[in-house]
Amino acid sequence: MNFSKLRHRIIFLRPTDETENSMGEIVPRYKPFKPYLPLELQVEVGRVYLSHDTDGNAVLLYDDGQPFAHKLALKEYSVAALVSPMSGREYEESQKIRAETTYKIATRFFKGVNQMHRILYNNREFEIVSVLDLGGKHEELQIIAAEKEKVTAQNLRGEDYDG
Protein backbone atom coordinates (compact mmCIF):
# COMPACT_ATOMS: atom_id res chain seq x y z
CA MET A 1 0.00 0.00 0.00
CA ASN A 2 1.16 3.49 -0.79
CA PHE A 3 0.60 5.18 2.57
CA SER A 4 1.22 8.62 1.08
CA LYS A 5 -2.26 8.39 -0.51
CA LEU A 6 -3.93 8.33 2.92
CA ARG A 7 -4.88 12.01 2.80
CA HIS A 8 -8.10 11.98 4.85
CA ARG A 9 -8.57 11.83 8.63
CA ILE A 10 -11.23 9.53 10.10
CA ILE A 11 -12.28 8.74 13.66
CA PHE A 12 -13.34 5.24 14.68
CA LEU A 13 -16.28 5.02 17.08
CA ARG A 14 -17.06 2.02 19.28
CA PRO A 15 -20.35 1.16 20.97
CA THR A 16 -20.17 1.52 24.74
CA ASP A 17 -23.20 1.85 26.95
CA GLU A 18 -26.81 2.30 25.86
CA THR A 19 -29.00 5.35 26.11
CA GLU A 20 -32.61 6.30 25.41
CA ASN A 21 -33.25 8.42 22.31
CA SER A 22 -35.96 11.06 21.84
CA MET A 23 -38.46 8.40 20.77
CA GLY A 24 -37.90 6.27 23.88
CA GLU A 25 -35.88 3.57 22.11
CA ILE A 26 -32.78 2.05 23.70
CA VAL A 27 -29.85 2.67 21.33
CA PRO A 28 -26.09 2.18 21.67
CA ARG A 29 -23.94 5.19 22.47
CA TYR A 30 -20.80 5.52 20.35
CA LYS A 31 -17.52 6.92 21.66
CA PRO A 32 -14.33 7.76 19.79
CA PHE A 33 -11.33 5.53 20.40
CA LYS A 34 -7.75 5.14 19.27
CA PRO A 35 -7.61 1.88 17.30
CA TYR A 36 -3.82 1.74 17.50
CA LEU A 37 -3.92 1.36 21.32
CA PRO A 38 -5.33 -1.60 23.30
CA LEU A 39 -8.57 -0.59 25.06
CA GLU A 40 -7.01 -1.02 28.52
CA LEU A 41 -4.36 1.62 27.67
CA GLN A 42 -6.77 4.24 26.35
CA VAL A 43 -7.37 7.33 28.45
CA GLU A 44 -10.63 9.16 27.82
CA VAL A 45 -10.55 12.89 27.14
CA GLY A 46 -13.55 13.70 29.29
CA ARG A 47 -16.65 11.66 28.53
CA VAL A 48 -17.16 12.24 24.81
CA TYR A 49 -19.84 10.58 22.69
CA LEU A 50 -21.40 10.80 19.22
CA SER A 51 -24.54 12.88 18.75
CA HIS A 52 -26.21 14.85 15.95
CA ASP A 53 -26.96 18.55 15.59
CA THR A 54 -30.27 19.99 14.34
CA ASP A 55 -29.09 19.71 10.72
CA GLY A 56 -28.37 16.00 11.14
CA ASN A 57 -24.58 16.37 11.13
CA ALA A 58 -22.64 13.96 13.33
CA VAL A 59 -20.87 15.79 16.17
CA LEU A 60 -18.96 14.80 19.29
CA LEU A 61 -20.27 16.11 22.61
CA TYR A 62 -19.20 15.94 26.25
CA ASP A 63 -21.66 14.29 28.66
CA ASP A 64 -22.84 17.74 29.77
CA GLY A 65 -23.87 18.55 26.18
CA GLN A 66 -20.98 20.90 25.39
CA PRO A 67 -19.43 20.39 21.94
CA PHE A 68 -16.07 18.65 21.69
CA ALA A 69 -13.94 20.73 19.30
CA HIS A 70 -13.49 19.05 15.91
CA LYS A 71 -9.80 20.02 15.75
CA LEU A 72 -9.21 18.49 19.17
CA ALA A 73 -11.07 15.33 18.11
CA LEU A 74 -8.87 15.03 15.03
CA LYS A 75 -5.75 15.55 17.13
CA GLU A 76 -6.77 13.02 19.79
CA TYR A 77 -8.49 10.25 17.83
CA SER A 78 -8.04 10.46 14.05
CA VAL A 79 -6.11 8.10 11.81
CA ALA A 80 -5.00 8.54 8.20
CA ALA A 81 -7.24 7.00 5.55
CA LEU A 82 -8.27 7.23 1.93
CA VAL A 83 -12.04 7.71 1.61
CA SER A 84 -13.54 7.22 -1.85
CA PRO A 85 -17.14 6.73 -2.99
CA MET A 86 -17.90 3.38 -4.61
CA SER A 87 -21.54 3.51 -5.61
CA GLY A 88 -24.74 5.36 -5.02
CA ARG A 89 -28.34 4.28 -5.30
CA GLU A 90 -31.79 5.51 -4.54
CA TYR A 91 -34.67 3.42 -3.30
CA GLU A 92 -38.20 4.03 -2.11
CA GLU A 93 -39.02 3.37 1.52
CA SER A 94 -42.30 4.36 3.17
CA GLN A 95 -43.24 6.53 0.18
CA LYS A 96 -39.98 8.51 0.44
CA ILE A 97 -36.96 8.43 -1.83
CA ARG A 98 -33.84 7.44 0.12
CA ALA A 99 -30.30 7.85 -1.16
CA GLU A 100 -27.52 5.52 -0.10
CA THR A 101 -23.85 5.92 -0.93
CA THR A 102 -21.27 3.23 -0.30
CA TYR A 103 -17.65 4.17 0.38
CA LYS A 104 -14.36 2.30 0.30
CA ILE A 105 -12.04 3.36 3.10
CA ALA A 106 -8.40 2.27 3.05
CA THR A 107 -6.27 2.62 6.17
CA ARG A 108 -3.42 0.95 8.00
CA PHE A 109 -4.23 -2.31 9.77
CA PHE A 110 -5.74 -1.94 13.23
CA LYS A 111 -6.54 -5.03 15.26
CA GLY A 112 -10.12 -5.24 16.50
CA VAL A 113 -11.89 -2.96 14.00
CA ASN A 114 -15.18 -4.65 13.05
CA GLN A 115 -18.76 -4.13 11.81
CA MET A 116 -19.96 -3.03 15.26
CA HIS A 117 -17.87 0.13 15.00
CA ARG A 118 -18.77 3.33 13.17
CA ILE A 119 -16.64 5.91 11.40
CA LEU A 120 -16.82 9.69 11.69
CA TYR A 121 -15.52 11.62 8.68
CA ASN A 122 -16.14 15.36 8.14
CA ASN A 123 -19.27 15.43 10.34
CA ARG A 124 -20.68 12.41 8.50
CA GLU A 125 -21.34 9.07 10.16
CA PHE A 126 -20.66 5.79 8.40
CA GLU A 127 -21.81 2.28 9.28
CA ILE A 128 -19.16 -0.35 8.61
CA VAL A 129 -20.45 -3.06 6.25
CA SER A 130 -17.26 -5.13 6.00
CA VAL A 131 -13.63 -5.07 7.10
CA LEU A 132 -10.99 -6.84 5.00
CA ASP A 133 -7.34 -7.46 5.92
CA LEU A 134 -5.93 -7.15 2.40
CA GLY A 135 -3.32 -9.81 1.73
CA GLY A 136 -3.68 -11.18 5.26
CA LYS A 137 -0.41 -9.48 6.25
CA HIS A 138 -1.86 -7.11 8.89
CA GLU A 139 -0.67 -4.08 6.93
CA GLU A 140 -3.79 -2.61 5.31
CA LEU A 141 -7.52 -2.60 6.01
CA GLN A 142 -10.12 -2.09 3.34
CA ILE A 143 -13.40 -1.03 4.90
CA ILE A 144 -16.69 -0.89 3.03
CA ALA A 145 -19.01 1.59 4.73
CA ALA A 146 -22.42 3.11 4.06
CA GLU A 147 -23.17 6.71 4.96
CA LYS A 148 -25.95 6.96 7.51
CA GLU A 149 -28.92 9.07 6.56
CA LYS A 150 -28.99 12.37 8.40
CA VAL A 151 -31.66 12.62 11.07
CA THR A 152 -33.01 16.16 11.00
CA ALA A 153 -35.74 17.92 12.92
CA GLN A 154 -37.82 17.86 9.72
CA ASN A 155 -37.51 14.06 9.50
CA LEU A 156 -38.54 13.68 13.14
CA ARG A 157 -41.58 15.94 12.72
CA GLY A 158 -42.69 13.95 9.70
CA GLU A 159 -43.23 16.98 7.48
CA ASP A 160 -42.89 14.83 4.36
CA TYR A 161 -45.80 12.65 5.44
CA ASP A 162 -48.92 12.95 3.27
CA GLY A 163 -51.37 11.12 5.56
PLM feature segments, named:
Residues 3-5, 14-19, 25-163:
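Short, conserved turn/kink motifs that form compact alpha/beta structural patches or helix kinks used as
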Residues 10-12:
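A short beta-strand micro-motif
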